[in-house]
């Protein structure tokens, strides 16, 4: 792009804030922060500016520059983190599949808090711990927590049943049962405080408390309580002893190590509490803008600690004190007390940081090696699939369609996309069937594929590019109907040659238009496994959407015309359970726990749900 065609920058202020680069369609390409917005943006467009190829590409694509003024660097830092999380700009380093990372939530906004795993939006009234790298690590942590602290597991802001009978969890030692007064509100609050202390890594203090309480209980001849406290201390000690002691002092801090290479980056966070490594989390980031490792870390830290527990000290490898100061100020506000963000020069803390840096590099190298091996295997599989199915080209983009309904009602369809043999979930689409009455799968399939291809012909970016293979969950009927659609829309060369095949469930046979018999792939072949995986994903996605619509309809039908349930009470019931599916699966005890719902009405709802 010649210099005179660069976007106008005359409106940019020489003050702190964030700048936003957009393309010709208004999409956010990059978000950055600066003490002087005008000067920082100008540096992108000077001949002596950043010469990285990706920055050159960014310059070529930017058509509009917006800004948001801030009252200082800390406010600019927060704005930048929020905008990156909201827009996920291509040229910013950002967590892969950010929505998929699980958290542990302690519902501190409730009178009797719950503790459970979540992937949903965060409620500012509650405390969140994470993100955790996997669901397995969350559930393992929750299991240890529940065995040790016996917090309640029943749903809703209020514990227990209206019947006053404690649940099974109480009888197996997994609930303190505040619902029946087995513990007071204050005692249950102490349980939750211990859960939070555990999640913050203050395990040694919890052990000391239990040992002291155990000795006191034994002295008072309360041997049953002393035995329970002994077991709790032993469980906590077991958790602690699995953690490697790394430093002589009892300091608590996080060490953030980052490694970046090309368009990928890895960040590893080593959590040290009371002198022990109590956790190590690894995150892979897309780094399309090819930022260096220090920039990746400084961008990642504010985003990560918006939801993660903030320690007293965060160690990073950047020596840029001016960049670290607003981060420290922001984290201090989040924690409520002073937080130090610095680069250690020597000693144990330096060694832990170097360990995090080394592991970040190893993590990225391992991921790349694994990705390369997967790509090689998938490439071979796709090539063999092309030969077996007589496709005109390598099926790099496979789209699969499935229909789901219940006796012709709430009829929906799914479109899932596999790119290079792997699911591209951001390109999944779902449809409500509009023109077909009843359970007519071939006609429904034809409608959906026609709508999808008409969007492609209209230039809709949400439905481009064209697939290399359309796969149908069905048999000859669906195949014939869709082949007719392709023939009609493809007349006059409007569509590229798009092959279509159908995978029948019963015999796992592949059908091709114009071929009387099926293509039979080897039962244990990678090619058939790939087609099955694509088909099963389309089936799952269609069923999930159908259940959602059916759940809404069933919820309305169960609650409509029910004596004692008006609009306000109906809204409270649905808010209590969160989703129609959770309501439809509710037990009588869970219905009785809905605030303000009489026991008689709860029993009537339960009877309607299970008749």
Curated annotation (Swiss-Prot):
Q: Where in the cell is it found?
A: Cytoplasm
Residues spanning the signal sequence: none
For this protein, the record's SMART domains field holds: GIYc
SUPFAM superfamilies attached to this UniProt entry: C-terminal UvrC-binding domain of UvrB, GIY-YIG endonuclease, RuvA domain 2-like
PROSITE patterns in UniProt: GIY_YIG, UVR, UVRC
- Gene Ontology BP terms: nucleotide-excision repair; SOS response
Identify the main location. Answer: cytoplasm
In terms of CDD domains, this protein maps to: GIY-YIG_UvrC_Cho
Q: Which InterPro entries match?
A: GIY-YIG_endonuc, GIY-YIG_endonuc_sf, GIY-YIG_UvrC_Cho, RuvA_2-like, UVR_dom, UVR_dom_sf, UvrABC_protein_C, UvrC
GO cellular-component terms in the record?
Answer: cytoplasm; excinuclease repair complex
Recorded GO MF terms: DNA binding; excinuclease ABC activity
Q: Which part of the chain is the GIY-YIG domain? A: 14-93
List residues of the UVR domain: 204-239
**Keywords assigned by UniProt, alphabetized:** Cytoplasm, DNA damage, DNA excision, DNA repair, Excision nuclease, SOS response
Please give the function described in this protein's UniProt entry: The UvrABC repair system catalyzes the recognition and processing of DNA lesions. UvrC both incises the 5' and 3' sides of the lesion. The N-terminal half is responsible for the 3' incision and the C-terminal half is responsible for the 5' incision.
Task: Report the sequence similarity comment from the record.
Answer: Belongs to the UvrC family.
What HAMAP family does UniProt report for this protein, alphabetically? UvrC
Subunit-structure text:
Interacts with UvrB in an incision complex.
Protein's name in the database: UvrABC system protein C
């Amino acid at each position: 792009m010649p210099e005179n065609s660069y976007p106008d920058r005359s409106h940019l202020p020489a003050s702190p804030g964030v700048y936003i680069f957009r393309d010709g369609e208004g999409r956010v390409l990059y978000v950055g922060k600066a003490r002087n917005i005008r000067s920082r943006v100008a540096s992108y467009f000077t001949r002596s500016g950043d010469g990285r190829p990706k920055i050159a590409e960014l310059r070529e694509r930017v058509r509009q520059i917006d800004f948001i003024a801030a009252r200082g660097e800390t406010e600019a830092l927060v704005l930048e983190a929020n905008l990156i999380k909201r827009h996920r700009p291509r040229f910013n380093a950002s967590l892969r599949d950010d929505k998929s990372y699980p958290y542990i939530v302690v519902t501190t906004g409730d009178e009797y808090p719950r503790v459970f795993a979540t992937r949903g939006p965060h409620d500012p009234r509650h405390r969140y711990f994470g993100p955790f790298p996997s669901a397995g690590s969350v559930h393992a942590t929750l299991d240890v927590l529940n065995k040790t602290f016996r917090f309640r597991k029943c749903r809703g802001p209020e514990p227990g049943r209206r019947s006053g009978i404690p649940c099974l969890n109480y009888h197996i030692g997994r609930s303190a049962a505040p619902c029946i007064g087995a513990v007071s509100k204050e005692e249950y609050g102490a349980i939750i405080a211990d859960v939070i202390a555990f999640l913050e890594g203050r395990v040694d203090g919890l052990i000391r408390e239990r040992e002291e309480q155990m000795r006191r209980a034994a002295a008072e001849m309360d041997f049953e309580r002393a035995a329970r406290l002994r077991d709790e201390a032993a469980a906590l000690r077991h958790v602690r002893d699995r953690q490697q002691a790394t430093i002589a002092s009892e300091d608590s801090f996080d060490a953030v190590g980052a490694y970046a290479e090309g368009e990928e980056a890895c960040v590893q966070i080593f959590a040290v509490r009371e002198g022990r490594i109590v956790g190590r989390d690894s995150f892979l980031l897309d780094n399309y803008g090819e930022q260096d490792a220090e920039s990746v870390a400084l961008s990642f830290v504010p985003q990560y600690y918006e939801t993660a527990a903030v320690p007293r000290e965060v160690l990073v490898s950047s020596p840029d004190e001016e960049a670290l100061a607003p981060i420290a100020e922001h984290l201090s506000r989040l924690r409520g007390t002073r937080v130090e963000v610095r680069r250690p020069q020597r000693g144990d803390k330096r060694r832990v940081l170097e360990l995090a840096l080394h592991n970040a590099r190893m993590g990225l190298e391992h991921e790349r090696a694994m990705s390369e091996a997967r790509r090689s295997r998938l490439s071979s599989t796709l090539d063999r699939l092309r030969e077996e199915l007589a496709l005109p080209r390598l099926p790099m983009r496979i789209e699969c369609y499935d229909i789901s309904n219940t006796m012709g009602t709430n009829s929906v369809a799914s479109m899932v996309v596999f790119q290079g043999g792997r699911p591209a979930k951001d390109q999944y689409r779902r449809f409500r069937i509009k023109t077909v009455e009843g359970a007519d799968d071939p006609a429904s399939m034809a409608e959906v594929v026609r709508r999808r291809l008409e969007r492609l012909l209209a230039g809709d970016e949400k439905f481009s590019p064209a697939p290399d293979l359309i796969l149908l969950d069905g048999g000859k009927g669906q195949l014939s109907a869709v082949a007719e659609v392709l023939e009609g829309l493809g007349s006059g060369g409007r569509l590229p040659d798009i092959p279509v095949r159908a995978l029948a469930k019963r015999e796992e046979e592949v059908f091709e238009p114009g071929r009387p018999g099926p293509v039979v792939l080897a039962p244990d072949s990678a090619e058939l496994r790939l087609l099955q995986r694509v088909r099963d994903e389309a089936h799952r996605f269609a069923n999930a959407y159908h259940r959602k619509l059916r759940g809404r309809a069933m919820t309305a039908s169960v609650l409509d015309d029910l004596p004692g349930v008006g609009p306000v009470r109906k809204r409270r019931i649905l808010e209590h359970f969160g989703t129609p599916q959770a309501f439809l699966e509710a037990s009588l005890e869970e219905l009785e726990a809905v605030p303000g719902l009489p026991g008689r009405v709860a029993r009537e709802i339960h009877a309607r749900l299970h008749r």
